[in-house]
């Protein structure tokens, strides 16, 4: 799964990752090294013929849900996303890209402790995770726009930490992923198979465990000898 991530790169850096990224008129969120569920994050959507950046809340609330409860999924499985009522409509017409510099997973050690790890590109560059978004007019007095992150079975180094990982879309698949006219299940599912899995994994301090902690310290590499993994 993906239950925490970070985004500190400027939008100008993400414009090198997402083709045709439009950030004009956007009041960008400040960098966040510890984005947690229910918090706001930056996503890219296809709107008025362009790829536009917006701030949405993490935890999907479908537009048809008139009385949103506590169940606000932060992840959706790529394998079954087209079948679940919670995600089905968004899967066809409301897909997005979640701006990210890295995400965190917790690995259970032999001593019972859970050690947090940071996962990101090997060269340290930013990337985008495949997501879904929704606009719900019933969730609050002014409505609420939300998103979730799509996950897939983990591979490579990521699989040594957790059995799931976010779908990281390469540039070649992004335009079609954002295009609502691409709505056939087979077409969209095919895009999810193109995930980029070249990730670097390293341990970080348990400082990241608390969502209240939000500084660069969350993503600093911790020496393996300090994790108690051996």
Please annotate each region the language model reported.
Residues 1-230:
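Short linear sequence motif anchored by a di-proline
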């Amino acid at each position: 799964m993906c239950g925490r991530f970070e985004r500190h790169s400027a939008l100008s850096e993400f414009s090198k990752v997402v083709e045709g990224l439009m950030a004009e008129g956007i009041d960008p969120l400040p960098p966040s090294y510890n984005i947690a569920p229910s918090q706001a994050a930056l996503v890219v959507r296809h709107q008025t013929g362009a790829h536009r950046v917006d701030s949405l809340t993490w935890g999907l609330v479908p537009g048809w849900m008139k009385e949103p409860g506590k169940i606000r999924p932060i992840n959706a499985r790529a394998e079954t996303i087209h079948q679940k009522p919670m995600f089905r409509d968004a899967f066809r017409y409301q897909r997005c890209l979640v701006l990210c510099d890295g995400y965190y997973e917790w690995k259970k050690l032999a001593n019972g402790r859970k050690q947090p790890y940071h996962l990101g590109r090997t060269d340290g560059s930013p990337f985008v995770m495949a997501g879904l978004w929704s606009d719900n007019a019933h969730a609050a007095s002014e409505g609420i726009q939300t998103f979730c992150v799509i996950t897939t079975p983990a591979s490579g180094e990521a699989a040594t930490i957790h059995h799931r990982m976010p779908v990281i879309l390469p540039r070649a698949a992004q335009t079609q992923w954002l295009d609502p006219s691409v709505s056939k299940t087979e077409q969209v599912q095919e895009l999810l198979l193109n995930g980029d899995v070249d990730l670097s994994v390293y341990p970080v301090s348990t400082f990241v465990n608390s969502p209240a902690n939000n500084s660069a310290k969350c993503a600093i590499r911790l020496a393996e000898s300090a994790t108690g993994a051996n």
